[in-house]
Amino acid sequence: MSAITPTRERILYAAAELFRRQGYAGTGLNQIVAEAQAPFGSLYHHFPGGKQQLAEDVIRAGGAFFQHLVTAIYDAEPNAEASIRAVFTTAAETLTATDFQDACPIATIALDVASTNDHLRRATAEVFEEWTTALTERLDDSDHALAILAALEGAFVICRAQRTTRPMHAAGEMAAALVTR
């Protein structure tokens, strides 16, 4: 990030990166402002609701960003099967390039807060619903869209735990086969 990037955006970006890698509970406010190179007071100036408001903004901004990214990858391919493979291949490449640290930021937060913070759980659920809707528009089958999203998110979790992209590739092949039926 550039030194001229506004403070709010630096804080949002730093929080998104840290939440994606460490989870919500594993990330402290001091760490966020240090990473953002921002004064501590600026966090509460821009996010008066504190860490929860910051996380909700990260969820919504991250959800929109990743939906745009995935749909761009998907739409660049000639057919649904190739599109699905490209999404899963890109996810595997990202995991490898980041030493399995970068996965889906929404899933990372959802897994962390689903049973302890209903406000953030609802925000993550809304993003997953938006993603399912976007994929349904491309596949014309909401069950297939949901199954593919579930396979992708589950593969992220298993890949990180096992430190291999094999689950992502296997899930991608299964998802691609689903759309060719």
Model region roles, listed by residue range:
Residues 71-102, 148:
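Hydrophobic alpha-helical connector segments
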Residues 10, 14-53, 57:
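Helix-turn-helix
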Residues 25, 78, 139-142:
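Short, charged helix-capping/linker segments at alpha-helix termini
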Residues 59-65:
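Short, basic, alpha-helical segments at the C-terminal edge of helix-turn-helix-like DNA-binding modules
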Residues 1-6:
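N-terminal intrinsically disordered/low-complexity leader segments
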Residues 55, 82-86, 97-122:
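Amphipathic alpha-helical segments used for helix-helix packing
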Residues 106, 117-130, 138-179:
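Hydrophobic/aromatic-rich alpha-helical bundle segments in the mid-to-C-terminal region
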